[in-house]
């Protein structure tokens, strides 16, 4: 047996976070247990869990402090409420049948325990660590989470300590608000008026980037830290270099022109995927985007069917969305140029995943009101809007 469990519980400085391994005495967990007892580390000295002095639980459990213990006051929080909490959680797990009595002499547990140096309330330290340990044991022996849960939740979750959400594009359709006005104060003001939504993307347009460079991404994050930000570079050369520049600036996606050499597009997509950002291929003035897709080694994450500002009076060019998705079923299709409220049903009906809207929102007299109208037209609820959530 070799099972892994994790749980976080509580709040404030007394918050408990427990990582643990459960396994056979003769296996890797048993070896880790023995090593922990015999190879001590300054500030992270392992200790046996005990319900009270002279009463350890079964299976035997080794506690390892995650945070360096620097003085006896901090040591008392481990050698006390945390030590007892972990032990009682193990004993209760046996009593409740989570751990079989037949296994208690065959397996051991190694638990890493987080105690913040500022934690003061021993009652909370005990209760939070008891709950976290018990939950971690149950999860470990129950195989939680399964891979389907991981994949479903990975794009929804915000790490409690990190404090902000990294947005990914997994639940279309989306509204992408494009800012071409090269005035950062105007852009920041307009972004602050756009309603917060799981289905809004912010685009740093080409003129904006030409004026301010990659630093404009940080300026946008000052207003909307968790925004999904597209850097519309319309790359034509040095694709890998420009993709790395966007990634280093904490952008989420880079736009490459479909007019670029195939080798440039390939290098940009490869570098984007290497650095964890999205690659968007813009078809502005490219008469045959399908042929470009067929020549690529790796598909972009998004293809943008784009009608330029200077030619927006002509009919839209969204008719080949179905053909694109036959070639690349997982690709997201964005439509840009001439997207008005009355055109939203048409675009969505033809299979568009992202609606790119610029001046219709950014130059309107009431940015918030118009943006809300576009968001509502997507007919898409917020992710987990009706979910009452503790941990799951």
From Swiss-Prot:
Name recorded for this polypeptide: Bifunctional enzyme Fae/Hps
Stretches the record annotates as Formaldehyde-activating enzyme: 1-161
Any one biological process term the GO annotation gives: L-ascorbic acid catabolic process
Region (3-hexulose-6-phosphate synthase) residue spans: 162-392
Matching SMART domains: OMPdecase (SM00934)
An example Gene Ontology molecular-function term: orotidine-5'-phosphate decarboxylase activity
InterPro entries: Aldolase_TIM, Fae/Hps, HCHO-activating_enzyme, HCHO-activating_enzyme_sf, HPS/KGPDC, OMPdeCOase_dom, Ribosomal_Su5_D2-typ_SF, RibuloseP-bd_barrel
Family membership: In the N-terminal section; belongs to the formaldehyde-activating enzyme family.
Reactions that this protein is recorded to catalyse: 5,6,7,8-tetrahydromethanopterin + formaldehyde = 5,10-methylenetetrahydromethanopterin + H2O; D-ribulose 5-phosphate + formaldehyde = D-arabino-hex-3-ulose 6-phosphate
Residue ranges that the Swiss-Prot or TrEMBL entry lists as coiled coil: none
Species assigned in the record: Methanosarcina barkeri (strain Fusaro / DSM 804)
EC numbers: 4.2.1.147, 4.1.2.43
Superkingdom of this protein's organism: Archaea
Keyword Cytoplasm: no
Enzyme class: lyase
């Amino acid at each position: 047996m070799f099972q892994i469990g994790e749980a976080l519980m509580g709040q404030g400085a007394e918050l408990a976070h427990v990582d643990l391994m459960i396994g056979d005495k003769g296996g890797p967990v048993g070896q880790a247990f023995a090593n922990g007892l015999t190879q001590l580390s300054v500030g992270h000295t392992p200790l046996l869990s005990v319900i009270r002095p002279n009463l350890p639980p079964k299976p035997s459990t080794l506690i390892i402090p995650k945070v360096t213990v620097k003085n006896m006051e901090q040591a008392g929080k481990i050698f006390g409420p945390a030590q007892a909490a972990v032990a009682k959680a193990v004993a209760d797990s046996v009593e409740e049948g989570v751990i079989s009595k037949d296994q208690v002499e065959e397996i051991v547990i190694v638990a890493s325990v987080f105690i913040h140096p500022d934690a003061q309330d021993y009652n909370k330290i005990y209760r939070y660590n008891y709950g976290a340990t018990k939950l971690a044991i149950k999860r470990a022996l129950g195989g939680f989470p399964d891979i389907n849960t991981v994949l479903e939740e990975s794009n929804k979750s915000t790490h409690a300590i990190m404090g902000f959400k990294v947005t990914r594009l997994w639940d279309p359709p989306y509204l992408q608000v494009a800012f071409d006005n090269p005035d950062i104060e105007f852009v920041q003001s307009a972004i602050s008026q756009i309603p917060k939504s799981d289905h809004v993307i912010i685009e740093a347009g080409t003129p904006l980037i030409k004026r301010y460079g990659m630093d404009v991404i940080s300026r946008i994050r000052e207003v909307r830290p968790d925004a999904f930000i597209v850097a519309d570079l319309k790359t034509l050369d040095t694709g890998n270099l420009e993709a790395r520049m966007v990634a280093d600036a904490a952008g989420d996606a880079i736009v490459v022109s479909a007019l670029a050499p195939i080798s440039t597009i390939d290098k940009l997509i490869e570098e984007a995927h290497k650095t964890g950002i999205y690659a968007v291929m813009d078809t502005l003035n490219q008469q045959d985007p399908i042929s470009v897709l067929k020549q690529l080694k790796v598909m972009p994450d998004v293809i943008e069917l784009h009608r330029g500002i200077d030619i927006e009076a002509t009919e839209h060019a969204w008719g080949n969305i179905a053909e694109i998705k036959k070639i690349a079923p997982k690709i997201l299709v964005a439509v840009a140029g001439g997207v008005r409220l009355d055109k939203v049903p048409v675009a969505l009906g033809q299979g568009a995943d992202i609606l790119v809207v610029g001046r219709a929102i950014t130059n309107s007299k009431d940015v918030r009101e118009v943006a809300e109208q576009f968001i509502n037209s997507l007919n898409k609820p917020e992710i987990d809007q009706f979910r009452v959530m503790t941990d799951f």
